[in-house]
């Protein structure tokens, strides 16, 4: 089971229309576009997917649509985390019902929960997932939950946990986790250190910019497997040039704008309170879309 979870997996964006409603046709196109890139799986309903500005019904609808398009073609991981254990359990049940391969959940946030409360939260979700492995999602910069190494070690050894999405930027900690848990599936979370994360022990990655250049990240994996560190470094540099621009524009809206210019996403808007891309960046984003389309062929 754990073997199937390894690889390069875009953190899927969620397209919306001009009325801020889910854009189902754009979502279907985006799933097909990602699969055509040769990625290994999709991570659905996470931070990149703007899950926390969606209702539970909307999140379930996204899971259903993605499963219709991708089940049996690539590995599917449903992020079901919310601050509410009950709602997370309901989403986990939906993920099982729609045929996902695993569930994932960010640490519960906003309130200062005790570590034992975090553990109980994960146990409850795992029970509701009916046998699907859990991918623990550690992202302290957004969750505000700063887990110690000992706490991470405890979480990843809970019955039912099969993987960790490590979005902390701490490569030393990544290596420590790998050393302590050689059989754990370990994902690099920050795209800008993907190659370094692999060298520190990650089995693959889950990232937002994979939506527009997943083949580059697959190229990094292949280069390192072949011992070509220079090629991996070159590809990481090319990815980071894109990330530099997206950080200026706002990552999610920048990605949607690039995908709009690629004729994948109809409306390049995130859900409010996110604002649209500043128009001054549109020429650069359009040029990036053209460059990536030419590179991909």
Curated annotation (Swiss-Prot):
GO terms for biological process: carbohydrate metabolic process; N-acetylneuraminate catabolic process. It holds the Pfam family DHDPS. It catalyses: aceneuramate = aldehydo-N-acetyl-D-mannosamine + pyruvate. GO terms for cellular component: cytosol. Its main location: cytoplasm. The active site is at 137 (proton donor), 165 (schiff-base intermediate with substrate). It comes from the Bacteria. Pathway: Amino-sugar metabolism; N-acetylneuraminate degradation; D-fructose 6-phosphate from N-acetylneuraminate: step 1/5. One of its GO terms (molecular function) is N-acetylneuraminate lyase activity. It is found in: Cytoplasm. Keywords: Carbohydrate metabolism, Cytoplasm, Lyase, Schiff base. CDD domains: NAL. Its EC number is 4.1.3.3. PROSITE patterns: DHDPS_1, DHDPS_2. Aceneuramate binds at residues 47-48, 167, 189, 191-192, 208. Catalyzes the reversible aldol cleavage of N-acetylneuraminic acid (sialic acid; Neu5Ac) to form pyruvate and N-acetylmannosamine (ManNAc) via a Schiff base intermediate. Homotetramer. Belongs to the DapA family. NanA subfamily. This is N-acetylneuraminate lyase. The gene is nanA.
